[in-house]
């Protein structure tokens, strides 16, 4: 069991977010670092699943659909966090609170909003 969820940032999430979260001690991988730029949302989520990472995105509509599809088909993911576009520092703070409040197992298969 992992205590903290490891994150995968979709390409629409700023690289600054990775820097801010790493400074707080969280394991973060960006789509850019992974060579996953220009991949569609299903591919992004599938990649996060392969790496056993929770995906962070600003793309609410597409990931709500993907989450529902995973549930219907009995597939599992490591969590989807939909983040409203806001100040990077505030968003990093909110993610930090969430990650310090829930274990990786508690985030698994959840669609969370911050």
Stretches with model-predicted labels:
Residues 41, 49, 53-66:
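Acidic, metal-binding active-site segment of PIN/NYN-like and related structure-specific nucleases
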Residues 1-11, 15, 20-23, 36, ...:
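Acidic, PIN/NYN-like endoribonuclease modules and their adjacent C-terminal/linker elements
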Residues 1, 26-28, 51-57, 83-86:
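N-terminal start-of-chain detector that recognizes signal peptides
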Residues 27-39:
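Conserved BB-loop
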């Amino acid at each position: 069991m992992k205590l903290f969820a490891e994150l995968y940032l979709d390409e629409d999430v700023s690289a600054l977010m990775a820097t801010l979260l790493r400074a707080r001690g969280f394991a973060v991988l960006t789509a850019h670092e992974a060579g996953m730029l220009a991949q569609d949302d299903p591919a992004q989520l599938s990649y996060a699943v392969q790496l056993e990472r929770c995906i962070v995105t600003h793309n609410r509509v597409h990931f709500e659909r993907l989450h529902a599809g995973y549930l219907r088909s009995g597939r599992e993911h490591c969590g989807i966090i939909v983040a409203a576009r806001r100040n990077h520092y505030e968003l990093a703070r909110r993610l930090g609170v969430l990650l310090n409040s829930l274990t990786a197992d508690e985030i698994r298969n959840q669609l969370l909003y911050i």
